[in-house]
Design a protein with these regions (language model features):
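Gly/Ser/Thr-rich helix-start
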Residues: 28-34, 72, 120, 135, ...
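Gly/Ser/Thr-enriched, mixed-charge loops and adjacent short helices
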Residues: 2-21, 133-266
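An N-terminal, well-structured beta->alpha segment
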Residues: 1-92, 169-203
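N-terminal small/polar loop signature for handling phosphorylated ligands or for N-terminal nucleophile
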Residues: 3-5, 61, 68-132, 219-268
Length: 268
């Protein structure tokens, strides 16, 4: 009786694995899904394990580091998912660096390349609607992995790779600040700011509630008053009701701000 019961359980688990793996398909620059439906912890953990295994397999002979950076954007539960995958990355024999706050994907890519670590996993859905979330994989050069890589990740998932998570072990780094300091090492930001003031140019930057919010202000050490103004820098998981993509149809607040600035200038 126990034999047949276990056999039935195995069959059901196999069906579940097939269902899970069939919903995981990589698209442009990563895997994405709707939060709570196809993007859930069960699917994400499988993708993370397969991604880590493939990063080790393909690049361990090209980089000595066993460190993986985990970054995340400002979407609903992004930080929670980022912290939740740490035990699975650790279980693959890799060390974790966790971003201290929300961060852009380019910042993660720069950090990986400059510190010569194995790669990065970024919890983000880029420009997709608010109810989406996803995972981007970056190789040791900070670049997006290619289609051959993601096909291998999908193959590993279909094989039913399951790794038991272990106790979280990670270090926290300010990835955004690292990027800002790198830019400052190349450019004289005070000179740029002074030139903008001299030319009487005011710059408006629409963060669209995204991960770049307040970065420009930090880049100029907070000395941007009357020269650079941020728009929609506060956190909003709904992104003002539109996808966070800089298309003309989604930039009403920026357009209105510019029109108001023009009207004020004409009055003076």
């Amino acid at each position: 009786m126990n034999y047949y019961r276990n056999l039935n359980l195995t069959r059901e688990l196999n069906k579940l694995d097939q269902t899970v793996s069939s919903t995981i398909k990589f698209g442009t620059d990563g895997w994405r899904g709707i939060i709570g439906f196809d993007f859930n912890m069960a699917n994400l953990s499988r993708v993370v394990v397969a991604s880590c295994q493939e990063l080790k397999f393909q690049y361990s002979n090209r980089v000595k580091s066993k460190k993986i950076l985990i970054g995340y954007d400002r979407r609903f539960m992004a930080e929670h998912f980022a912290k939740s995958i740490i035990p699975f990355v650790n279980a693959c024999g890799l060390e974790v660096i966790l971003s201290s706050s929300f961060v852009t994907t380019p910042s993660c890519s720069l950090y990986v390349r400059e510190l010569n670590i194995l790669g990065a996993l970024v919890i983000t859905a880029s420009h997709n609607p608010y109810n989406w979330l996803g995972l981007k994989i970056k190789n040791f050069q900070g670049s997006s992995v290619n289609e051959l890589f993601t096909k291998e990740v999908e193959r590993r998932i279909k094989l039913g790779n399951i790794t038991e998570p272990i106790k979280s072990n990670y270090q926290i780094e300010d990835i955004k600040q690292f990027h800002i300091e790198k830019i400052n090492s190349y450019f004289d930001m005070q000179f740029i700011l002074d030139r903008l003031r001299k030319m009487n140019i005011k710059v408006f930057i629409d963060a669209m509630h995204g991960s770049s919010a307040a970065s420009i202000n930090k880049l100029f050490n907070g000395n941007t008053q009357s020269v650079i103004q941020g728009i929609r820098e506060e956190k909003d998981p709904y992104f003002s009701g539109n996808p966070p993509e800089p298309l003309i149809n989604y930039l009403d607040e920026l357009k209105n701000t510019l029109l108001q600035k023009k009207e004020r200038d004409l009055k003076h």
